[in-house]
């Protein structure tokens, strides 16, 4: 029997992480988030980096125009830049985790990495600005919608660079859910119902 995998992408402040935790608890699935980054860093020999250093490293996505330039992709020495190696390592880990058992993968372009696998349900989680503003104030240390949107812009840039697709475009996901007007528990039940009928 094939393992079921839920790949969740989410707007900052939409409650996507909390939704992933609820789904993991209801389904008994393992949840993977930042662990994937640390696993990849360990395999690349950069496990000594702090969480903030790894985050800064990830946010440093080169301009899309450089992506197909041979001198950038392989460098003057012929070696790939570390951020390319990091993404490739994370992708390899994601594919392995998807084979190991039922799981939920939060972010990391998992929907694109696992594209074509029939047992994968890709979900995009969004919310209106009022909801995100409230969560920014209460959950994310008083972050404003502007700050949340800046984080989303980084996610969109990262996603576009490594997948060639538009982050958040509903056509790229099996489900898009808006957390603004329903409880996360109810939305989790909708996702579970969809998976059971898929």
Residue ranges and their predicted role:
Residues 2-5:
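Extreme N-terminal starter segment of soluble prokaryotic enzymes
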Residues 91, 184-192:
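Short, amphipathic alpha-helical "lid/cap" segments that border enzyme active or binding sites
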Residues 30-42:
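Short beta-strand-centered segment that lines the nucleotide-binding/catalytic pocket of NTP-utilizing
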Residues 8-21:
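Glycine-rich phosphate-binding P-loop
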Residues 116-150:
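Conserved phosphate-donor/acceptor-positioning beta-strand/loop module used by diverse small-molecule
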Residues 61-67, 142-185:
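Small-molecule kinase domains that catalyze NTP-dependent phosphoryl transfer to phosphate-bearing small molecules
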Residues 41-102:
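ATP-dependent small-molecule kinase phosphotransfer cores
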Residues 97, 110-116, 137:
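RNA pseudouridine synthases
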């Amino acid at each position: 029997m094939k393992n079921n995998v839920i790949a969740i992408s989410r707007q900052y402040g939409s409650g996507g992480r909390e939704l992933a935790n609820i789904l993991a608890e209801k389904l008994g699935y393992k949840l993977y988030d930042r662990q994937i980054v640390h696993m990849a860093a360990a395999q690349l020999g950069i496990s000594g980096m702090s969480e903030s250093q790894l985050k800064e490293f990830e946010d440093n996505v080169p301009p899309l125009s450089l992506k197909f330039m041979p001198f950038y992709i392989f460098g003057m020495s012929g070696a790939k830049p570390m951020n390319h190696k990091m993404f490739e390592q994370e992708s390899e880990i994601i594919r392995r985790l998807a084979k190991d058992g039922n799981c939920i993968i939060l972010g990391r372009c998992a929907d694109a990495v696992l594209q074509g696998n029939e047992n994968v349900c890709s979900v995009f989680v969004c919310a209106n600005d009022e909801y995100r503003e409230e969560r920014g104030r209460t959950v994310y240390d008083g972050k404003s919608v502007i700050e949340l949107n800046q984080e989303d812009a980084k996610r969109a840039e990262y996603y576009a660079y490594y997948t060639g697709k538009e982050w958040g475009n509903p056509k790229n996901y099996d489900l898009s859910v808006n957390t603004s007007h329903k409880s996360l528990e109810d939305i989790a039940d909708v996702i579970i119902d969809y998976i059971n009928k898929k």
